C-alpha cells in the first residue's frame, strides 16, 4: 500500500481527548462525535481504516466502501463481518477490559504494519 492511511473515527464522543492519542504512523485523521446511519458511507468513502464504537456498519455500507481495508471496533457496534470477509476487509475488536489508549493505537499501528509487509 502506498500513500497515507485515511483513518476515520465515526463516534469519537465515546472517549475523552486523553483516552485515545492519535497514532504515530503516516495518516490523515478525521473524527466525528457521532455518525447517523445516512452519514456512514459519505464519511468512510475515502477511508482505509474505520474506527467505530457504537455506529453499525452493515453489508450495504461495506459494499460501497472500495478503499476500506480495516475496521477497528472499540465497543458494541455491529459490523457485518461476513460482508467484510467477502471484500477482504480485516475486522479487529478491542477486548473488554483492555485499556483503549494502549490498545487502539497499538492495534492501528499493527494493522498498518501488517498491510505494508
Regions found by a protein language model. Name each.
Residues 1-47:
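N-terminal glycine-/charge-rich "phosphate-binding" loop or analogous flexible N-terminal tail
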Amino acid at each position: 500500500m502506498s500513500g497515507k492511511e485515511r483513518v476515520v473515527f465515526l463516534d469519537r464522543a465515546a472517549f475523552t481527548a486523553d483516552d485515545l492519542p492519535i497514532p504515530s504512523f503516516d495518516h490523515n485523521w478525521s473524527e466525528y462525535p457521532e455518525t447517523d446511519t445516512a452519514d456512514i458511507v459519505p464519511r468512510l468513502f475515502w477511508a482505509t481504516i474505520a474506527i467505530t464504537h457504537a455506529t453499525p456498519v452493515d453489508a450495504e455500507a461495506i459494499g460501497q466502501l472500495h478503499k476500506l481495508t480495516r475496521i477497528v471496533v472499540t465497543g458494541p457496534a455491529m459490523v457485518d463481518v461476513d460482508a467484510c470477509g467477502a471484500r477482504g476487509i480485516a475486522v479487529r475488536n478491542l477486548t473488554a477490559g483492555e485499556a483503549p489508549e494502549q490498545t487502539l493505537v497499538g492495534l492501528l499501528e499493527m494493522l498498518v504494519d501488517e498491510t505494508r509487509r
